[in-house]
């Protein structure tokens, strides 16, 4: 995966930097797709950033029987950055943004309501879908591993 990181991370970093967003978000596709642009989930998510059809279309990715821009590293990265930026505009908390990226803003909003309006990830943890409860810690671990793999 480190070889793939050398190819894809500069694409991710350029797009994130252009929008003044945390460069650590480049690790999301590690969790989403293991940096495989052809990855396809059981739920129908596709590409490096694992866009669902509806989210991909919302962010202007062309998806037809001939073309699927969710698999295009540059176009899907630009769309993912716009989506992450929109989520940050809603939550103003990067951990909640990462959770919402995984399970959708509707599920995060429901978890916040069920937690009495608390907006701290760890306060809403048990009200999130099981997959998302593992997703955020996996993202944190990927950050650590990729940042310190030379020291291991």
Where do the model's predicted regions map?
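Solvent-exposed loop/turn segments at secondary-structure junctions
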Residues: 33-36, 55-58, 104-107, 145-146
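Extracytoplasmic and endomembrane cell-envelope/extracellular-matrix remodeling and assembly machinery
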Residues: 1-14, 18-19, 63-66, 70-90, ...
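Short, surface-exposed glycine/acidic/tryptophan-bearing loops
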Residues: 38-60
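Short, functionally critical alpha-helical segments immediately adjacent to catalytic or ligand/cofactor-binding
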Residues: 21-38, 97-102
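Generic alpha-helical secondary structure signal
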Residues: 7, 23-24, 50-54, 58, ...
């Amino acid at each position: 995966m480190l070889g793939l990181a050398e190819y894809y991370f500069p694409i991710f970093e350029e797009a994130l930097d252009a929008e003044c967003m945390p460069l650590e978000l480049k690790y999301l596709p590690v969790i989403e797709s293991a940096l495989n642009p052809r990855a396809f989930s059981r739920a129908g998510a596709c590409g490096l950033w694992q866009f669902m059809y509806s989210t991909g279309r919302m962010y202007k990715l062309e998806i037809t029987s001939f073309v699927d821009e969710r698999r295009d590293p540059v176009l899907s990265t630009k769309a993912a950055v716009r989506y992450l930026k929109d989520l940050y505009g809603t939550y103003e908390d990067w951990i909640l943004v990462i959770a919402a990226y995984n399970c959708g803003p509707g599920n995060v909003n429901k978890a916040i309501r069920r937690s009495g309006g608390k907006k701290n990830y760890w306060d809403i943890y048990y009200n999130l879908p099981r997959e998302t409860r593992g997703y955020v810690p996996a993202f944190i671990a990927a950050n650590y591993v990729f940042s310190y793999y030379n020291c291991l």
